[in-house]
Amino acid sequence: MHRRRRDNLMTPAEMVASMKPPQSLSTEDDDGSRRDSESSADVLKSNEEFQARMIPEDDDANSVTAQPTWTVLSDTEIKSVLVVASFAAAISPFSTSTYYPAVFAISQDLGVSVSKINLTMSSYQIFQGVAPTITAAFADTYGRRPMFLVCFAIYFVANVGLALQNNFTTLLVLRCLQSTGSSGTFALAQAVTADITTRAERGRYLIYATLGSTLGPFLGPVIGGLLVKFLGWRSVFWFLLCMGTVFALLIFIFFGETARPIVGDGSVPPQSWNRSFLQIRSKGITSLKPNLASLERRKSRPNPLTSLALLWDRENFILSVSGGLLYAGYSSVTSVLASQLQQRYKYDAVQVGLCYLPVGFGSLLAYRTTVRLMDWNFEREAKKQGLVIVKNQQTDITRFDLEKARLGFVFPMILVCSVLLVAYGWQMHYHAPLAPILVTMFLIAIILTGVMNAIAALLTDVNRENAAAVGAAMNLTRLLLGAGAVAVVGPLNKSAGIGWTATVTAGLWVLMMPTLRMVYRDGFVWRAGENERVHASNVELAALVRS
């Protein structure tokens, strides 16, 4: 099992005194085999006793260990950095959503079926999952800013080629290249959020960190529909090229490095080649004294396998697959909506684009509703467990049941979303009026955005030192599952109908819930046991060195 390094770990003595799990938990013999001598009821009781020892008593609630300030950036500066990063990440969802209204026109112009054009969406999602693992590895070593600029350079080349190509094979290859450039920016934006925000405050900053990626599904189909109708489908790629140029200029001029191994809390100047245009103009002059103690360990060389290694951890794996299944179901809805509206309702590209607006409105509204619920539940659990939250100070999670704080509200939301997805499928199947279909899509977007953000926040929280890598790992699982869903949904719709397709998807969501609940119930114990094993290994290593 992959061993993750946790921040703010306790000393070995404290680990032995307060973290050692009772013998009733599953232990290992010398030969590595697992033993479990008690009944399941006894094990559950022991787990509860273990958690009770790990969570501070109420008497200690007011004793706060002094923590350093997490970032020197002001609240306004944090929001500005997150907005710039989120707009840079917007090229990924824009490249997906502006393409939807063009599918029918491209298939007619190139003389291929819509199913073949759907393969370009599946291949796009596959590369959207794989490419960030490489981007994240280099970003954790060399910084976020240079990798943003590299991603944009690849993106520019792909869009020029897509606007000029004339056959399906070239379209397929260049869509993969376009995905390689655009998808890395999404993982980088997630890493920037982890660099400059604390766990307790992350929810309230999510609206800024995800503004660009939310506007993609919101505005992309409308813009794509207008472009296809009045200028032709090639204009979609020229538009993406121009938009990418604007966002790249924002990074080049305004965006400063945020990776903590390079700039720490923001007070340490980055390398001269890794400064924004504004920093170069000011010649690096700052009134801040560099806080070298805030620098984190820097990886000596990029390792693209880090993202895959993180998935070897059972908590990471369950969370990533759960988020992936939710995303796959969501993708299966949005990817076929365009063709369904054109075939069943005889809508043109502009009308199809307008029908995507409720999805965007729902996603945007989620950051004013369900994401605030995430912060509220975090504060409630912290108070319940006797943890004091201090503004701009990182929360120590070694004695905090973070899983209950993040996942406490997601299970009823998944059930409601499953019911809504079934309703959407059968409404489309029976050619229901468009109004209830759009309302259903709006509600799905609100609820599902909140659930996926809660899962993503938990993954980032427990892997903060590998923020870019865990973002890439999450993208890898969800986009590979999403690509599979998009590839399967077309044939499944033809054979069984969209009603049964939606019903099967909702059933998978419900079947996923018991596994996700294992993380909610036992994730804290898993992390505590892993921390103890890491410390035990460190003690053994130190003893060998001394001898």
Curated annotation (Swiss-Prot):
Annotated region described as Disordered, given as residue ranges? 1-45
Parts of the chain that traverse the membrane: 81-101, 146-166, 206-226, 236-256, 317-337, 347-367, 407-427, 432-452, 469-489, 496-516
- An example of a Pfam family matching this protein is MFS_1
Keyword tags: Glycoprotein, Membrane, Transmembrane, Transmembrane helix, Transport
Task: Give its localization.
Answer: Membrane
Q: What GO molecular functions are on record for this protein?
A: transmembrane transporter activity
- Cellular component annotations (GO), alphabetically ordered: plasma membrane
Provide the residues annotated with a glycan attachment (glycosylation): 118, 167, 274, 493
Q: What is its main location?
A: membrane
State the membrane topology. Answer: Multi-pass membrane protein
Question: What role does it play?
Answer: MFS-type transporter; part of the gene cluster that mediates the biosynthesis of squalestatin S1 (SQS1, also known as zaragozic acid A), a heavily oxidized fungal polyketide that offers potent cholesterol lowering activity by targeting squalene synthase (SS).
PANTHER family the record matches: MAJOR FACILITATOR SUPERFAMILY, QUINIDINE RESISTANCE PROTEIN 1-RELATED
- Tell me the protein family, please: Belongs to the major facilitator superfamily. CAR1 family.
What is the recorded name of this protein?
A: MFS-type transporter M6
Native organism: Phoma sp. (strain ATCC 20986 / MF5453)
Upper taxonomic lineage: Eukaryota, Fungi, Dikarya, Ascomycota, Pezizomycotina
